[in-house]
């Protein structure tokens, strides 16, 4: 059995500072930058950090990890993972991931580039996760750009270039899971996401299942081109309220590429309907 390892590894609440390193890992379950039980703080400035194995993100966080002005590449894995009450903060980084359809530990559940979740293994304290990226580029070669399950989290993007090479991949998927990996109880393991686009341009579809919630805010001249859909939980879980709440602040825009279903809408900006509709939870159908 191969135990998880990392190029830069922090455990037990320690603090690690690294500057302008070249780090490469080749084994499976070997993130280039990772933390383990006990949390801690990791600060990385500049450099190149590459993982080549399966189940080996460029960054796996069970701590508070900040990376600035660096290149982060996962050649056979999702790029980034946040587990539990922890965080990843990126500034002006070039990030790319290429998760396998079959060889990733969670490939049977979802293929993605950034995963935010609670594993229930005891590796990470339960609580609200945080992911923030300012500037730089985030490239996904396969699957969804963001996948969130069995946790609460805040996602903030500002001035990031987003690229998804998989035409079928979602920009964001917020759902429960089958619990086959121990991530909560099927039908009760949805996610709660607060997503803020701040001076951000983004394109792609968002999907939220009926046991999960999304609170999306577009601010500071952000533009979102895509759809939002509420879908049934695959395991028949009891639906919750406020599955998809959207706020568009002054100067920001939502460009629809298809019909949408959301719970409620506060619009002080602009919506380009392009012939499509938005259906609210109370049955109201909005048209251009």
Spans of model-derived segments:
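A short local loop/turn or secondary-structure capping micro-motif enriched for an aromatic residue
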Residues: 98, 212, 233-235, 263-266, ...
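Generic recognition of long tandem-repeat/solenoid scaffolds
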Residues: 172, 271, 286-288
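Surface-exposed loop/turn positions within long extracellular repeat scaffolds
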Residues: 240-246, 254-266, 279-281
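Surface-exposed loop/turn motifs in large extracellular/passenger domains
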Residues: 1, 5-28, 34-54, 59-76, ...
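Extracellular, surface-exposed repeat architectures
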Residues: 224, 259, 275-287
């Amino acid at each position: 059995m191969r135990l998880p390892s990392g190029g830069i590894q922090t455990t037990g609440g320690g603090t690690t500072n690294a500057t302008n390193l070249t780090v490469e890992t080749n084994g499976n379950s070997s993130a280039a930058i990772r933390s383990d039980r006990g949390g801690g703080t990791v600060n990385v400035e500049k450099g190149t950090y590459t993982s080549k194995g399966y189940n080996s993100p460029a960054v796996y966080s069970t701590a508070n990890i900040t990376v600035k002005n660096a290149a982060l590449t996962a050649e056979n894995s999702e790029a980034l993972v946040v587990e539990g009450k922890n965080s990843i903060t990126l500034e002006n980084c070039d990030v790319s991931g290429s998760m396998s359809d079959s060889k990733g530990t969670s490939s049977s559940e979802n293929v993605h580039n950034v995963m935010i979740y609670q594993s229930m293994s005891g590796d990470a304290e339960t609580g609200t996760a945080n992911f923030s990226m300012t500037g730089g580029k985030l490239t996904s070669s396969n699957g969804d750009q963001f996948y969130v399950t069995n946790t609460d989290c805040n996602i903030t993007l500002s001035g990031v270039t987003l690229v998804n090479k998989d035409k079928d991949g979602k920009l964001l998927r917020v759902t429960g899971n089958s619990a086959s990996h121990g991530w909560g109880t099927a039908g009760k393991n949805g996610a709660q996401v607060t997503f803020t686009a701040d001076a951000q341009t983004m394109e792609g579809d968002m999907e939220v299942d009926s046991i999960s919630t999304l609170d999306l805010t577009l601010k500071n001249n952000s533009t979102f081109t895509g759809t939002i859909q509420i879908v049934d939980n695959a395991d028949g879980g009891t639906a919750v309220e406020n599955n998809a709440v959207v706020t568009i602040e002054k100067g920001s825009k939502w460009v629809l590429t298809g019909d949408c279903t959301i719970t409620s809408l506060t619009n002080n900006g602009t919506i380009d309907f392009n012939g499509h509709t938005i259906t609210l939870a109370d049955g109201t159908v909005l048209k251009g």
